[in-house]
């Protein structure tokens, strides 16, 4: 109990204050200056120069609109001679920050509601009606089974289904891509950005871009880095892939627009930087369900008034426009906070040198004696002298 009281008294009735001791030591002096220089280099070089710790920052707010141009020609036995324009291959016409360009297609023409044989596969091939379950509809089925086994061709029988007939046969994807000419289509990206904290706005069609230039330019990282018109084949090429290979089964491409701006400089120096990458994983070894595709239909009625449709399985490339960026501008508050933090860090040099001198060096006991001085209470000391 007495020990606890003594410890409590020592805690309550003692006070320590720093004492400046000048130690003439090359090792300690050099170490102290080296640590101080490292801290100064960190504060000035990293915090203020690289990270711009004197600036207030804001994240970009963005809007994007796109427009595709280009015409393709096909001549097949199924469709004959046909022209494909923007209304045919951009599906849907407008999306938020992205667009889909059809590059390949499987068409099933003149479908009507009726009964027809399924496409042969492991689950639909049959030998008798016993192999077909009436009323069943699997996840990969084109319709509802009638329970009958009917001839698909002269040598193969499959289960009959109630469906849109004839059913789609997507066993073989056309190669090369049906719209391989899409490689030369162009994409105009119009991007408006805003930094609300600084009330700063800009768009990627820069003030010096004229109508004449916009009609003739195509983006090139070296010759035309600020042209907002991109050739589709070049986008895929810049991401390290082949457009013709990607066009067969489709995929997803990212067009990245970076707006990192230093608003302490002229507004004309705040410029967009474009980069490209493929967003869907293309793993050759695990090539299950590759690419990008979806189905849609065009409905109409024949002369007799019967409903028909053309089923379209569209393969293509979806282009996602991804806008990101950060703007910074001088502000006194972050500047003072970082200066204060830097000054506080300089105290680390003294703490580190104290640890070395007082606990690691050979003369640590001598230095400790010089560093600390124990002083009794003046009033108690005076009373003791008077008693004597």
Curated annotation (Swiss-Prot):
PROSITE patterns linked: P2X_RECEPTOR
Glycosylated position list: 75, 110, 153, 184, 199, 208
Kindly give the Pfam families that the UniProt entry links to this protein. P2X_receptor
- Protein activity control: Activated by ATP. pH-dependent and inhibited by acidic pH.
What residue ranges are annotated as transmembrane?
34-54, 339-359
Q: Name one GO cellular component term.
A: extracellular exosome
Its record classes its membrane topology as: Multi-pass membrane protein
Q: Name one GO biological process term.
A: calcium ion transmembrane transport
Describe the task this protein carries out: ATP-gated nonselective transmembrane cation channel permeable to potassium, sodium and calcium. CTP, but not GTP or UTP, functions as a weak affinity agonist for P2RX4. Activated by extracellularly released ATP, it plays multiple role in immunity and central nervous system physiology. Plays a key role in initial steps of T-cell activation and Ca(2+) microdomain formation. Also participates in basal T-cell activity without TCR/CD3 stimulation. Promotes the differentiation and activation of Th17 cells via expression of retinoic acid-related orphan receptor C/RORC.
Give the quaternary structure.
Answer: Functional P2RXs are organized as homomeric and heteromeric trimers. Forms heterotrimer with P2RX1. Interacts with P2RX7 (via C-terminus); this interaction is functional only in the presence of ATP. Forms heterotrimer with P2RX4; functional differences between homomeric P2RX4 and P2RX4/6 heterotrimer are minor. Interacts with AP1M2.
Q: What is this protein called?
A: P2X purinoceptor 4
């Amino acid at each position: 109990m007495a020990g606890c009281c003594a410890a409590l008294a020592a805690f309550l009735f003692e006070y320590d204050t720093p004492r400046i001791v000048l130690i003439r030591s090359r090792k300690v002096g050099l170490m102290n200056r080296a640590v101080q220089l490292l801290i100064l280099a960190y504060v000035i070089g990293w915090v203020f120069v690289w990270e711009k710790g004197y600036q207030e920052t804001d994240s970009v707010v963005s809007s994007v609109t796109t427009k595709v141009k280009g015409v393709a020609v096909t001549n097949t036995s199924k469709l004959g001679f046909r022209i494909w324009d923007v209304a045919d291959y951009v599906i849907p016409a407008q999306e938020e920050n992205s667009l889909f360009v059809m590059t390949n297609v499987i068409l099933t023409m003149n479908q009507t509601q009726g009964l027809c044989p399924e496409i042969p596969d492991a689950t639909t091939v049959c030998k008798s009606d016993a192999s077909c379950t009436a009323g069943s509809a699997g996840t990969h089925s084109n319709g509802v089974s009638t329970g009958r086994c009917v001839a698909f061709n002269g040598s193969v029988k499959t289960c009959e289904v109630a469906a849109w007939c004839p059913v789609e046969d997507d066993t073989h994807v056309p190669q090369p891509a049906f719209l391989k000419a899409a490689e030369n289509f162009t994409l105009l990206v119009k991007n408006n950005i805003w930094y609300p904290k600084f009330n700063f706005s800009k768009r990627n069609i820069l003030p010096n871009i004229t109508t004449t230039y916009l009609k003739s330019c195509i983006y090139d990282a070296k010759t035309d880095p600020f042209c907002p018109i991109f050739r589709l084949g070049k986008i895929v090429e810049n991401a390290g892939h082949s457009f013709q290979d990607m066009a067969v089964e489709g995929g997803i491409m990212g067009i990245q627009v970076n707006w990192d701006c230093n608003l302490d400089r002229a507004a004309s120096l705040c410029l967009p930087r474009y980069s490209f990458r493929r967003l869907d994983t293309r793993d050759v070894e695990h090539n299950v369900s590759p690419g990008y595709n979806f189905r849609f239909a065009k409905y109409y009625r024949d002369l007799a008034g019967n409903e028909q449709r053309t089923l379209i399985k569209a393969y293509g490339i979806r282009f996602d426009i991804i806008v990101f960026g950060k703007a910074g501008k001088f502000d006194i508050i972050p500047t003072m906070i970082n200066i204060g933090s830097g000054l506080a860090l300089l105290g680390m040099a003294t703490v580190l040198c104290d640890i070395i001198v007082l606990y690691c060096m050979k003369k640590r006991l001598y230095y400790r004696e010089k560093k600390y001085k124990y002083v009794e209470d003046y009033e108690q000391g005076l009373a003791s002298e008077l008693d004597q």
